[in-house]
């Protein structure tokens, strides 16, 4: 018998408690293990959600692990549950979509997947991760909208979604993130308004929403409730309206960055209450009114950038009390009054930029207290008086731009104290006195421009010490003495222009040591002696101009070694001897002018080996003799030939092959024989042929005689002929009466027949005038005028593509029918005013590499045909807007087209006599050749400037819709400046990829108004924005030139010659600036989005120096507005 002992009650309770505890532990363990397993599964699933294998750095992610806590980039909680609290992946190229099962991570506090090429949309499930404190998904390729479910995250402190492709609005639900401190959503494609609900987040310290070009509306007044806000960045958006007064409540605000937007109204004086403000960036807006003096209370402000607004009035003295300021930029406004003397209190000031205002008075000497000043730019104002010698105390000064003012007196010797000076431009002032020798002791000086002053004295011998010089321009002064031999020490000099002075003595041999020289202009001085043989060592020289001096001796044979030379101008000197045959080796020569010398001998045949000689060959006013060599016909591209006032003899048959000649002068020689029966000779006037007694035209025994005996003989012949003429007159009158009756009958017949035939081929003989050597006939052309060959229609006619029997393809423009007189000499002289006569008159007289080649014309009663070279790539308009591959039109090609078109238009305006106004510049009238070279075409509305009715109203609208200059609407006047405006519109079209009136431009704005409002890199064609920084810089500088061209005031627009010069120097200036800055701040090859970066704002700065048509700005302002490292420091991209 067994006895069962009873269990005590206390022990039974203990066993029961243990059992419950064990059950709970097991349940928790199983639950925790299950959660960890789910997280492992979720991470592995995400890692393999792409077809590409995951990066090797994720090899430690083992799907067999029970939890991911030991995996790279993963952090778990310290408790026993081992749940993921952090996912931190930065700068690893994942190329994965956003984690689809993000809600699996219930304890996640920090989600950082930045700069990993994360794709897809942000899942709304992210709002279920209620523990999240930090979300950083910046610098990826995310698309779609920002999930409104983020508003559920009450613990969220940082939300960084910047630099993605997010669209849609900023969700108002973000206002429910009551713990949010940093909101960074800049550089996306967000739109609509900034939610006023953000004003509910009292913890907010940073709002950065810039770079969203469609973000619009006003800055909400409620932002003033975010009392902890330190950064407000809304740059490069469409934010409009006024700055809210409530911003003055933000006492902790450190950076206000709302540049390149559509802000208007006045700067609120309440900003003076933001006592912690460090950066105030409001440039490139439409702000108006005066600068509030209350800003003077901002003792912590370091940078105040307000350039390119409409601010006016005096600059308050109180600004000088902001002792922390290191950068002030008030350029491109309408400030008046003087430079405040209180600026002398700004001991930390590094940059003071006041360019392009209406500032008067003198430069305060007290600015010398600003000992840290690096840039001082006061150009394009009305500043007068002396340059204070105290400026020389600024030891850190790099750049001093004071051009286009009213400065007077001497350049102070004390400027030599600016030991770090790199660029000094004081052009277009009233400076006198001599050049300070100390300037040439500055070992960092690269550019010295003193154009158009009244500087006298000699060039100091110390010039040889300034070995850093790249550009030296002393044009149009009163400098005397000799050119110092020490100039030969300037090994970096590429541009030397000493023209229009009173220099004397020889051209120094030592100048040949400047091996980098590309341009040497010593013209319009009184230099004597020989031209140095050693100039041949300047193998990079492109322009050599020593005209209008007193140089003697022979032209050196060694000039033939200058293989890069394209312009050689030796005119108006006393050179003797023969023309060296070695010049034939200068194969790049386009212009050769040896006129007005004492050159003798024959014309060397070797000159005719220069195939590029297409602008001019001028050998006039010399003592050349002999025959014209037959080989001269090889210069088939030559436009101007002047061999007048020599002793040349023989016949002129050799000249008949020069089919492209526009101007020919053979007067005052000893030519004989008949004039060739070619176009250029038929167009010569008497003054261009006179003085050749033996020269005759076919059908006459003598044509150009001028001695008295021959004139007496002519009088006798004339008397005899007069008697015969009277006898014939009676007979002819009777015949004409009969013919008159027949003509009336015939006219009625023709009118009736004309209604049945557009061409009237059977009624009127076709007239054919070729301007080139053509291998086809009118009949060949007419056969091609069928509907299937039409390639375009315009306001002046239809354009056909025509293939000739010899497989040559040409373009034929058939002008719209209009009955006009036959274009015989009589009607030409009377000035027919239709598109045919205008275009023939214009195109037949010009030659330029960027103007479409006019082959010839043919016409009859009412059909008029113009023939051109056919352009295989069509027009610029079709390239930009009608082809799917527009993005493949790279910057190099676009720049080439812009520059070439400018050069062609400059030729029309400045090199044609008389000047020619195109009147219809547009993208469709710029044709594109096989190598993407541009050609200006369609002169259907062209008028010559000296036409009597040129400036009066025209019955035909001059120009095309979208391109017409604004002054035409009220004055109906067309000038060269009208062409400049139209060209500016074309440049905007090329840069933006948009048409002048484009449906994609918001609010129906014209491209000009749109660009002026945006004025940022955002206007650049999307296909170009990813180009290297150096190219983007060139685009923005080109945009600055375009803004000059579209100035609403015609007088303030540059000439096309200046435009072409500016564009030509953009690349060159950038290269030189890299030398100046040591590649500081401008040699980066890329842009890391989201970091402080100066690219776009530096480009904005370029525009402000493009406001003057001064020739000096192209040599300095373009460079120093865009490449200075100091400038870069004050253009942060705080979006």
From Swiss-Prot:
The modification Phosphotyrosine is found at residues 868, 907, 963, 970. The gene is RGI2. Disruption phenotype: Smaller root meristem size and fewer root meristematic cortex cells, associated with shorter roots and a slighty reduced sensitivity to RGF1. Quintuple mutants rgi1 rgi2 rgi3 rgi4 rgi5 display a consistent short primary root phenotype with a small size of meristem associated with a total insensitivity to RGF1 and undetectable levels of PLT1 and PLT2. The triple mutant missing RGI1, RGI2 and RGI3 is insensitive to externally applied RGF peptides (e.g. Residues 36-723 are extracellular. Specific to root meristems, especially in lateral root meristems (LRM). The modification Phosphothreonine is found at residue 777. Disulfide bonds join 69-76. A motif (Small peptide recognition) lies at residues 186-187, 208-211, 231-236, 259, 281-283, 329-332, 351-353, 399-403, 425-428, 447-451, 471-473. Coiled coil: none annotated. Residues 785-1066 form the Protein kinase domain. Gene3D superfamilies: Phosphorylase Kinase, domain 1, Ribonuclease Inhibitor, Transferase(Phosphotransferase) domain 1. LRR repeats lie at residues 105-129, 130-153, 154-177, 179-203, 226-250, 251-274, 276-298, 299-323, 325-345, 346-370, 372-395, 397-418, 419-442, 444-466, 467-490, 491-514, 516-538, 539-562, 564-586, 587-610, 612-634, 635-658, 659-683. This is LRR receptor-like serine/threonine-protein kinase RGI2. It comes from the Eukaryota. PROSITE patterns: LRR, PROTEIN_KINASE_ATP, PROTEIN_KINASE_DOM, PROTEIN_KINASE_ST. ATP binds at residues 791-799, 813. It comes from Arabidopsis thaliana. GO terms for molecular function: ATP binding; peptide binding; peptide receptor activity; protein serine kinase activity; protein serine/threonine kinase activity.
